[in-house]
């Protein structure tokens, strides 16, 4: 479970039966929660090696770099692991917005349906499909 590295104890993330771990992206300055996604080992390794957030899309069944299409990258400054080692936080600098709907955070709606954020971009313009 743990690997020793000098004076540090390296943590081995516990991926679920599908090889995934939930990842919360959190703004490193404001501490706002930006999004929840999933990562496999390859995504975590790429995040560590490149410094940019990578995730695994469960709906598309593929690895993806946050912002690869929109340009709204997440520069990862630190990766935190919870006490059970089965959830991760990426502390990030978010370029523009995290949510594909155009909001800074994917958590822009309250349970009663009211919107608590401001749309930062038009998704129809950013995600134009080439014909």
Curated annotation (Swiss-Prot):
GO terms for cellular component: cytoplasm. InterPro entries: PRA-CH, PRib_AMP_CycHydrolase_dom, PRib_AMP_CycHydrolase_sf. Keywords: Amino-acid biosynthesis, Cytoplasm, Histidine biosynthesis, Hydrolase, Magnesium, Metal-binding, Zinc. NCBIfam families: PRK00051.1. Belongs to the PRA-CH family. Homodimer. Catalyzes the hydrolysis of the adenine ring of phosphoribosyl-AMP. This is Phosphoribosyl-AMP cyclohydrolase.
